[in-house]
Structure formats: C-alpha cells, structure tokens
Regions:
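Serine-hydrolase catalytic machinery in alpha/beta-hydrolase-like enzymes
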Residues: 2-89, 101-104
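Conserved alpha/beta-hydrolase "acid-adjacent" motif
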Residues: 32, 145-151
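Active-site loop->helix "elbow" adjoining a glycine-rich segment at hydrolase catalytic centers
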Residues: 95-99
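A conserved short beta-strand
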Residues: 110-122
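Post-His helix in hydrolase/transferase enzymes
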Residues: 173-188
Length: 190
C-alpha cells in the first residue's frame, strides 16, 4: 500500500513552493493523525508543499516485530525522500517511529532540516538514532512513558539541536500547538 496524503499550497504550483515536507506518523497512528495533520497545516500556510505517507500496512506486520516492519517503513521513506529531494529543499518531520525513520533517512538523502517529536533513541535491532548534520528541532515530553527524556536530551545536546521539553506524555496531546510553533520556527529559519 503506497498511499499518500499530498498537498501543495493552493496559490503556488509545486515548482514554486519554498520546498517540500514529508510528515511521518507514529506507530499505530496514521496519515490523518492530529500532530502530522497540524504540521501539514503549518507547512501549507508557510508555502511548503507536503505529504503524509501511510505506513499503517507496515505497522500491522506484527509477525516481524512488535512495532511492525521498521526496515520496510524506513525504505519507503528513503525512496520517497530521494525522489522529492531532487526537486528542491526537503524537510523530514515525524512523531515517535516517524521521527526515527526521518532522522535515519537524513543520513541517506539530502535534507534541509529535521523536525522530530518524541524520537526513540534506540529501536531494537535497528541502528541507534542518528541524523545528518542539518538544522534539527526536537520536541519531547518530560513524562514520556516510552522514551526517557534524559536519553533525548543527551542525543539533542550532542547535535546542538533545538530542544523543547514539555510537561506531557508520549502522545504530546496537550502540546500540539507548541509542536506547531516549533515546526514553524524551523521552517522559517531555513
């Protein structure tokens, strides 16, 4: 299943947008999830084209791992990002598992920036979280029940990434607006 929710700014054809954002949802979420939808609205308003790939078919593959087929998820993003990077500036953004694959993809595909929400610093047998040396903005929750804040703080510090820590849990449900503001700051800074 290769489904994408893809939009270009209404008043700009794709070739005239500021760039393109690929917004990757978290595990057992979807392309219409609250956070990636809110980020799409920010990108649209700022003149960036955007898309939200659907990884739900891969997340459902529990026979591969408890978080589905992560290598196939990563490959799907790498292939799409490589295609879009040939057209102009590319920003990858994601939540949780979507943040992980966005960061790892940046090591293989040229990107202008990364926006990572509650990124896991480890992913079982997959490589530890790493990212290209590009502008990185991270939003993480002090009370994340899955990913210790201390691990993300250390990871962000090593890369001198912009880091916003909020009083919330892994889903960042009380900080969607704060996440959008941080994403807007990243896009405006590029």
């Amino acid at each position: 299943m290769l489904a994408f929710t893809h939009e270009f700014p209404h008043d700009l054809p794709p070739a005239m947008s500021r760039g393109h954002c690929i917004l990757s949802h978290g595990f057992e979420s979807g392309p219409d999830a609250t956070k990636v939808t809110a980020l799409a609205d920010v990108a649209q308003r700022l003149g960036w084209s955007h898309e939200r790939p659907d990884y739900t078919d891969l997340d459902a593959r529990h026979e591969i791992s408890r978080v589905g087929d992560v290598p196939a998820r990563l490959q799907r993003l790498v292939e799409r990002a490589a295609e879009m990077a040939t057209r102009g500036p590319l920003v990858l953004a994601g939540s949780s598992l979507g943040a992980y694959i966005s960061a790892i993809t940046s090591l293989q595909v040229p990107v202008a920036g990364l926006f990572l929400m509650v990124p896991p610093t480890t992913m079982g047998p997959m490589p530890a979280l790493d990212a290209a040396a590009v502008p990185i903005s991270v939003v993480h929750a002090w009370n994340d029940e899955l990913i210790p804040a201390a691990d993300v703080i250390a990871w962000a510090a090593e890369r001198k990434a912009r880091l916003l820590l909020v009083n919330d849990g892994h889903r960042l449900m009380r900080h969607v607006d704060a996440s959008c503001q941080a994403f807007e700051a990243l896009l405006r800074g590029l």
